[in-house]
């Protein structure tokens, strides 16, 4: 089963995902993952983990998003520099969609 977590045992619900490809290097892609209502204690968050039966993808680029001074969620930026990394992320997202 595929899960997305900031902290062990606390599964997060992904609100939105946007994938962008580099204009000059099509093998380089970035996924922006949005979580509007994180369940984890944000003071303890150090990384974002995407786990499934293949293993774990860990991302450390996490940004707090605010609108007019109010917290609206978190944005996780996952950079993929190869087709293999993109394929792995795609397989995870397929599993996450079925979970």
UniProtKB/Swiss-Prot annotation:
Pfam families: Psb28 (PF03912). Keywords: Cell inner membrane, Cell membrane, Membrane, Photosynthesis, Photosystem II. GO terms for cellular component: photosystem II oxygen evolving complex; plasma membrane. One of its GO terms (biological process) is photosynthesis. Its main location: membrane. InterPro entries: Psb28_c1_sf, PSII_Psb28_class-1. It is a peripheral membrane protein. It is found in: Cell inner membrane. It comes from the Bacteria. Belongs to the Psb28 family. Part of the photosystem II complex. This is Photosystem II reaction center Psb28 protein. It comes from Gloeobacter violaceus (strain ATCC 29082 / PCC 7421). The lineage of its organism: Bacteria, Bacillati, Cyanobacteriota, Cyanophyceae, Gloeobacterales.
């Amino acid at each position: 089963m595929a899960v997305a977590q900031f902290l062990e045992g606390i599964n997060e619900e992904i609100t939105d995902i946007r994938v962008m490809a580099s204009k000059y290097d099509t093998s380089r892609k970035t996924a922006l993952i949005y979580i509007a209502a994180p369940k984890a204690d944000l003071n303890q968050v150090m990384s974002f983990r995407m786990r499934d039966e293949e293993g774990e993808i860990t991302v450390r680029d996490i940004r707090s998003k605010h609108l007019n001074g109010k917290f609206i969620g978190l944005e996780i930026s996952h950079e993929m520099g190869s087709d293999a990394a993109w394929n792995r992320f795609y397989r995870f997202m397929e599993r996450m969609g079925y979970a």
